[in-house]
Every structure is written in C-alpha cells, then in structure tokens.
C-alpha cells in the first residue's frame, strides 16, 4: 500500500545512536529482497565506533536480545493486541487518558515525539493522530502487536530497546511520554531519569506511575507472590478458566433480593457494567477482566511511588513548570526542560 510504514525507514537512521557508546549507526547488511524505497525489512545495523551490531527483524531494529523482565507483557499484548485500542473498543478511553496526562495540544505537526514503553500501541495511535513523527519502543515483544496496529501510519518508527539504554540521539525530541510503564521497571527513578537526556531544551515530558498507599496493600499485592511463580501462559489459562464463571455467578447473585448484592460484591472481579461511558458486551467485559487480572498479577515488577518522590525526581532532573496531580493510573506528572542550560558557578581562586 503506498505511503504505509512497512519497513524500517532509513530516513530516521540519523536519530538513532549506539546504546553502548552513543556513536552513529550505519546499515551493515540487508537481506536479499529485504529492502526497497529506502526501507529495510531484514538486515543489521552497526556502530561506527564500537563493535556493537543490532539486527533488523520484521522491519524493526532490535537493541536487546530478549524481553528480560518484561516477558509477561510481550505475552500479554500479543494475545490482547486489540482490546485497549479506542478504534476497536468503540470508546475514547485511551485518548482521554493521553490528553489528561500530557495536557498537550491535538496538533503536533513538525514535532518529534518519543514514547517509552509502547505495549501494543494504544497511545502510539493517539500520538500519531497529532501529526507528529513518533518514535516508539518497548523492551518486550509487544512491539510486534504495535507494529501490526500502526503499520498504516507514515511517521512511526517502532523498535525494541531497554529504557535504561535508549538507542537514540540526545536532545532529539520535542516531547516524551511514558504511560503505564515506570512502575514495572526494576529501578523506577533511574528509568525516569534515563529519559531526560533525549528531551530537547524547551521540550516537555509527561509520565504516569502507580501511587503508593500507606496501610493495608491492595488485594493484588497479596496474590502477586503466588501468581508470579506461574508462567504468563499458565496464569492466563487459570484466569480464563475462573473469571467467566465468576462473572456469571456475580451477575446471578445481583438478581437475588436483600443479600444477593452484598454477596456479589465479595467476588473480586470489579463491576459488571461500565455503562453509559463504556458500552461493553458481556463477552467483551469478560475479556477486559481477564486482561486486567493478567496485567495486575503477572509483571515481574510493580513499584508504586509517593507523590513527593516523583516531584523530587523532576526537580533533580532540572525540569521547570512541574505539574503533578492524581489522575489516570495514579500519579500524573509533567515538566519542561529549561531553554537555557543551568549556570555552573566556579569557586573563586584565592
């Protein structure tokens, strides 16, 4: 299809950099029949300064050799690859969350945006609708689902990389966002700090992260130590075996006068309807609940944060215009990189 993004676009190569040493990358190899019109389906990138090489597989450069701690998300988003897409679920939930978190305008033509942790591309889609050029990465194989969901966009560049070793040129982005990701990183603060060097002066960054609550932890934190011992495939099978009948049981209990509703509320699968805001069928809602449970129980890391700590990160990063609030997903925070670098005052000689 003319104008579609089906291969790695070599015009974006000057934005990439070696994650090991920061030097430029060059195309070292192209598979026979694997490139056309300045785009590559299969091949290899090589650093111009150090021995590092990186494969291009199925049109996407890969800067990690495995999913590491994010393997559960790779499994999750390749199986639920449409369930949170606004256009598929007939709602604007992702759009609402994106704009509530970022506060950005709906038109970003001429700007370059970085998405850190893309999953299957629910927010990639919204960012692309602004007209911006979007670079989107994930540690996990969820990039395969994102690629499938957004291949009709001409200005998207999807790649697999670690948030701790981002393979891009510094100060190359007008805007950076990271949503639904930070709490699942081993070192949450360092994951946030790793994004700052890639933001241009005057550029904006917006993130969200789970909020830490004092007192008795939510139910999922009691279940996670047991659930995490299972492979994602096994946990998914258990949830698919248990949640649909629990849904039907809860639905039946609500019809029983007096005590039925109180008993039904003890079944920990959330509400049976989100109407009028979200008009799911029962079958769709069962799938949503299976996905939600898998998302809560399977990640290797889940580290909620305190508002004061998030504010301290933004201040330590030297950002200005800091705004922090509670919203979608917990803590929403944004800030701007100063146009002028900070002044360094040297000590007078005596």
Regions found by a protein language model. Give the residues of each.
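Extended, charge-rich helix/loop segments that form flexible
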Residues: 232-288
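A short glycine-rich, Lys/Arg-flanked "PGG" loop and its adjoining helix->strand segment in the class I
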Residues: 189-201
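Conserved, well-ordered alpha-helix/loop/beta-strand core segments that scaffold catalytic motifs
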Residues: 313-314, 319
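Conserved N-terminal segment of class I S-adenosyl-L-methionine
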Residues: 2-169, 175, 301-303, 309, ...
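A short SAM/SAH-binding and catalytic strip from SAM-dependent methyltransferases
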Residues: 174-187
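Conserved class I S-adenosyl-L-methionine
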Residues: 204-237, 241-244, 248
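Glycine-rich, histidine-containing beta strand-loop boundary motifs that form or position
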Residues: 138, 160, 180, 209-211
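Short, glycine-/aromatic-enriched active-site segment of Class I SAM-dependent methyltransferases
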Residues: 210-227, 282-300
């Amino acid at each position: 299809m003319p104008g579609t993004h089906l291969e790695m676009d070599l015009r974006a190569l000057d934005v990439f950099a070696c994650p090991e040493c920061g030097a430029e990358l060059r195309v070292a190899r192209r598979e026979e029949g694997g490139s056309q019109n300045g785009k590559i389906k299969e091949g290899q990138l090589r650093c111009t300064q150090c021995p590092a090489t990186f494969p291009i597989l199925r049109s996407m450069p890969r800067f990690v050799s495995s999913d590491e701690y994010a393997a559960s998300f790779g499994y999750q988003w390749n199986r639920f690859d449409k369930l949170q897409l606004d256009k598929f679920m007939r709602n604007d939930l992702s759009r609402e969350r994106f704009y509530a978190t970022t506060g950005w305008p709906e038109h970003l033509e001429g700007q370059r945006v970085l998405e850190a942790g893309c999953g299957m591309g629910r927010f990639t889609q919204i960012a692309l609708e602004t007209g911006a050029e979007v670079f989107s990465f994930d540690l996990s194989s969820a990039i395969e689902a994102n690629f499938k969901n957004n291949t009709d966009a001409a200005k998207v560049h999807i790649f697999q990389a670690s948030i701790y070793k981002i393979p891009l040129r510094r100060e190359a982005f007008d805007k950076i966002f990271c949503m639904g990701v930070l709490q699942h990183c081993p070192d949450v603060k360092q994951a946030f700090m790793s994004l700052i060097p890639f933001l241009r002066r005057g550029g904006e960054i917006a993130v969200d992260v789970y909020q830490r609550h004092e007192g008795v932890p939510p139910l999922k934190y009691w279940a996670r130590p047991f659930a995490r011992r299972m492979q994602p495939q096994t946990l998914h099978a258990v949830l698919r075996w248990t949640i649909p009948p629990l849904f039907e049981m809860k639905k039946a209990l609500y019809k029983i006068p007096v005590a039925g509703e109180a008993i039904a509320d003890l079944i920990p699968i959330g509400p049976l309807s989100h109407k009028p805001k979200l008009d799911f069928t029962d079958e769709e809602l069962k799938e949503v609940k299976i996905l939600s449970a898998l998302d809560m129980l399977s990640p290797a890391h889940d580290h909620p944060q305190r508002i004061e700590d998030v504010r301290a990160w933004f201040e330590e990063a030297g950002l200005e215009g800091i705004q922090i609030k509670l919203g979608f997903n917990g803590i929403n925070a944004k800030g701007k990189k100063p146009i002028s670098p900070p002044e360094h005052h040297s000590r007078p000689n005596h």
